[in-house]
């Protein structure tokens, strides 16, 4: 495969591609390249893909925890837009997340909120989140802004009373992130206004203890 990554020429053999391969989905295949990930769209992914113009715009926006496109990937022979690069973050299980101290966890939610505000101020609307697309290395990152789905709204949040490990992990993944209320952030048709009337991180902060873990917090609140 012959690629142009911005202005950098890169030629990869099938063996190279197999060595660098990280995984794939309905939308794309991803490969590790230095400190970046190459996201190369599948030919049949259709409307799921970002177009080159959108990817280029996002690459010029700085965010803390939303991993946006960094460089544009094109076919070196015909110039066709193939995908983009983003920062490589080594993933960890949700076990690491539920062991985070609440102070650190809430700071991460605050940074995610700031990222959404930054995108909103640049006239970029994030409609879909997929909370399975998280990367954790002591910090929490959300990957692929084109494929996110918020699982719950604050009105639907409930504290689970059965706090075994599997249920707790699912709760943290599906509900706690939803409590960041990222889904409330929408581009306004007239003025770009960030809606944080129900940013639930503030509500959690009122009941959380800085030195307890996310697991301890959930168990305490579920009593």
Regions found by a protein language model. Give the residues of each.
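Conserved kinase catalytic-core helix
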Residues: 95-136, 140-141
């Amino acid at each position: 495969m012959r690629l142009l990554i911005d202005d950098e020429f890169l030629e990869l053999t099938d063996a190279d591609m197999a060595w660098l391969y990280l995984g794939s989905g309905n939308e794309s295949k991803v490969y590790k390249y230095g400190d970046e990930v190459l996201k190369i769209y599948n030919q049949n992914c259709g409307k799921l893909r970002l177009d080159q113009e959108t990817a280029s715009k996002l690459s010029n926006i700085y965010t803390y925890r939303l991993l946006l496109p960094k460089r544009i990937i094109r076919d070196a022979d015909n110039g066709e837009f193939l995908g983009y690069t983003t920062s490589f973050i080594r993933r960890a299980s949700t076990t690491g997340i539920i062991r985070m101290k609440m102070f650190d966890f809430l700071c991460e939610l605050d940074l995610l909120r700031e990222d959404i505000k930054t995108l909103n101020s640049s006239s970029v609307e994030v409609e879909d989140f997929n909370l399975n697309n998280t990367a954790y290395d002591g910090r929490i990152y959300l990957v692929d802004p084109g494929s996110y789905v918020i699982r719950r709204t604050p009105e639907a949040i409930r504290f689970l009373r059965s706090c075994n490990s599997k249920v707790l992990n699912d709760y943290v993944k599906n509900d706690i992130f939803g409590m960041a209320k990222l889904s409330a952030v929408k581009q306004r048709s007239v003025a770009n206004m960030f809606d944080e009337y129900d940013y639930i991180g503030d509500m959690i902060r009122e009941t959380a203890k800085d030195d307890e873990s996310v697991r301890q917090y959930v168990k305490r609140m579920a009593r």
